[in-house]
UniProtKB/Swiss-Prot annotation:
Its EC number is 2.1.1.192. One of its GO terms (cellular component) is cytoplasm. NCBIfam families: rRNA_mod_RlmN. The lineage of its organism: Bacteria, Bacillati, Actinomycetota, Actinomycetes, Mycobacteriales. Pfam families: Radical_SAM. It comes from Mycolicibacterium vanbaalenii (strain DSM 7251 / JCM 13017 / BCRC 16820 / KCTC 9966 / NRRL B-24157 / PYR-1) (Mycobacterium vanbaalenii). The gene is rlmN. One of its GO terms (molecular function) is 4 iron, 4 sulfur cluster binding. Keywords: 4Fe-4S, Cytoplasm, Disulfide bond, Iron, Iron-sulfur, Metal-binding, Methyltransferase, rRNA processing, S-adenosyl-L-methionine, Transferase, tRNA processing. This is Probable dual-specificity RNA methyltransferase RlmN. The keyword Iron applies. Coiled coil: none annotated.
Length: 365
């Protein structure tokens, strides 16, 4: 097993990007417009352009007087990042973008097109401080938090690409890219509010179509429940026992399995939403029949019908000694979890060959 890395909850103190329109809530937008000496109605106009028409360049905002476009661009729409590399697979249905921020920081997002939906997997941090040994992102360490605008710009870029490509619409947003979302709590919550707010205050994506993942920061899970955002909570559990989870998911040394599941139950009770349990199945590590039985027993006892297990065949990462469990073992694991009365399916893995699947994002390049 790889030498453990330290847990990092607080991002290194690095300068954040300049203020961007997407960092601002409704009152902040009004204040920013007033600072520029513009009429109050311009704030709503700019929001309609950004969130409704997906335009982030004021020089293209035709309902804005030409004389003020450059001033608005300089004050509210600085360049945050650009695409450093783009790669596709699945016949063009999966597309990974490596973004490079103005300070050189890199992070990734993945756009996945399905017959019935379009999903973008976005990053909340550049890197990750949770140090999970089977995850390429966790092994790379934490560089810095992303700003609210950097998070939202990933969503806007994906939405604009779908629209421009074939008139498609973004339907789902999952915070399953780089980083631990609940370790960048305030910015992630602000981003979720604007993702789900109706136009002109946000992108208008249903809260039920937004998923926030976590390795199990129990107090933050409870805090998120009290926000009443009603997004889907995805808990990366990966094993039901503390002995193994202390190593597989090092944050377990801070909050044990039972405490994390208790927080998940609180989330389900407050929101009425089913909690998703993410479980990367690793050959001869966490795929034993007794672990399937214990997982089903614990989840059924804590969450009853308000839980679903997503089994994820382990995706390969450079230098890893681990690989996915054989299909017969996977099928038996599913059967045993279901036998305990818990819904369980194997996730459709996209992007494995371009290192765009779960646990593979490393922002290299």
């Amino acid at each position: 097993m790889p030498n453990p890395l330290p847990l990092v909850f607080d991002a290194p103190r690095r300068a954040m990007p300049p203020r961007h329109f997407a960092d601002l809530d409704e009152s902040g937008r009004a204040a920013a417009v007033a600072e520029l000496g513009l009429p109050a109605f311009r704030a709503k106009q700019l929001a309609n352009q950004y969130y409704g028409r997906l335009i982030a360049d004021p020089t293209q905002m035709t309902d804005l007087p030409a004389a003020v476009r450059e001033r608005v661009a300089d004050a509210l729409f600085p360049t945050l990042f650009g695409a450093a590399r783009e790669i596709e697979c699945d016949s063009g249905e999966t597309r990974k973008v490596l973004w490079r921020a103005v300070d050189g920081t890199t992070f990734e997002s993945v756009l996945m097109r399905y017959p019935d939906r379009n999903t973008v997997c976005i990053s909340s941090q550049a890197g990750c401080g949770m140090a999970c040994p089977f995850c390429a992102t966790g092994q790379g360490g934490l560089k810095r938090n992303l700003s609210t605008a950097e998070i939202l710009e990933q969503v806007r870029a994906a939405s604009a690409e779908l629209r421009d490509r074939d008139g498609g619409r973004l339907s789902n947003v999952v915070f399953m890219g780089m980083g631990e979302p609940l370790a960048n709590y305030n910015r992630v919550v602000a981003a979720v509010r604007r993702i789900t707010a109706s136009s002109p205050n946000g992108f208008g994506i249903s809260a039920r179509s937004v998923t926030v993942s976590t390795v199990g920061l129990a107090p933050a899970i409870r805090k998120l429940a009290d926000e009443k955002l009603n997004v889907t909570l995805a808990l990366s559990l990966h094993t039901p026992d503390d002995e193994l989870r202390d190593t597989l998911v090092p944050v377990n040394n801070r909050w044990k399995v039972d405490e994390v599941l208790d927080a998940a139950r609180y989330y389900a009770d407050v929101t009425g939403r089913r909690v998703s349990i993410e479980y990367a199945l690793i050959r001869d590590v966490n795929d034993q029949p007794w672990r399937a039985d214990l997982l089903g027993k614990k989840l059924h006892g804590e969450l009853g019908p308000l839980v679903h297990v997503n089994l994820i065949p382990l995706n390969p990462t450079p230098g890893s000694e681990w690989d996915a469990s054989p299909k017969p073992v996977e099928r038996e694991f599913v059967r045993r979890v279901r036998a305990k009365g818990v819904s369980c399916t194997v996730r459709d893995t996209r992007g494995r060959e371009i290192a765009a699947a779960c646990g593979q994002l490393a922002a290299e390049g």
